[in-house]
């Protein structure tokens, strides 16, 4: 495309007035299109090339915008969940209706290794997830999770995990989620870290100093003499 030509709009007939066209190096880009849709663009005669020559005659091109690539992620960095009662964790997906889930417990002595190996609170590549599974975390539950899915849109679902954590001792856990489809099994693995406990700690700073408060997470009441 001609470097001197800045506005290519007059050379392209767009199927929707909301679309925009612009040049990026050797490419002519159309913005505003939707995923999973077909369009027809008409390039008018005279469309300039970098050599200075122009398109001889009007040309129509039909193209298809593919659906979004399936994706899974956890929007939160960490949670404190009660060891009893109902519990769920939000997950965000794109074009996925089912996930493979694995719950692992991380012992106190392995928490430091999680930070040393940069495995905390981030999506992991497969080799990192395998390291977490083999050397650091102990698998305590596995299963599948169903998610809400609207084609090509971000969808958020609350995954119920009451069954997975039932009977588990207090401690640090990580829930791994990966796409069910074999096609995407070599992508990253989403991880959600959380602490399973009945005790919640908070602090308040005032003129009289720092006060530490201890509450029962499930009952939202003070821990008494704790």
What are these regions (language model features)?
Residues 1-226:
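N-terminal, cleavable Sec-dependent signal peptides of secreted/periplasmic/extracellular proteins
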């Amino acid at each position: 495309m001609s470097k001197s030509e800045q506005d290519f709009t007059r050379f392209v007939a767009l199927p929707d007035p909301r679309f925009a066209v612009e040049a990026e190096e050797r490419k002519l880009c159309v913005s505003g299109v939707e995923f999973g849709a077909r369009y027809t663009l008409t390039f008018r005669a005279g469309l300039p090339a970098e050599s200075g020559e122009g398109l001889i005659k009007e040309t129509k091109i039909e193209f298809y915008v593919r659906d979004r690539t399936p994706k899974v992620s956890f929007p939160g960095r960490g949670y404190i969940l009660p060891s009893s009662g109902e519990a769920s964790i939000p997950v965000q997906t794109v074009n996925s209706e089912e996930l493979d889930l694995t719950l692992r417990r991380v012992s106190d002595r392995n928490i430091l290794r999680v930070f040393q190996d940069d495995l905390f609170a981030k999506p992991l590549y497969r080799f990192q997830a395998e390291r977490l599974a083999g050397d650091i975390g102990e698998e305590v539950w596995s299963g599948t999770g169903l998610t809400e899915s609207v084609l090509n849109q971000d969808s958020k679902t609350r995954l119920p995990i009451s069954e997975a954590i039932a009977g588990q001792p207090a401690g640090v856990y990580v829930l791994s989620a990966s796409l069910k489809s074999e096609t995407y099994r070599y992508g990253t693995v989403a991880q959600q870290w959380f602490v399973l406990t009945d005790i919640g700690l908070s602090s308040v700073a005032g003129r009289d100093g720092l006060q530490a408060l201890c509450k029962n997470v499930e009952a939202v009441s003070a821990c008494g003499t704790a």
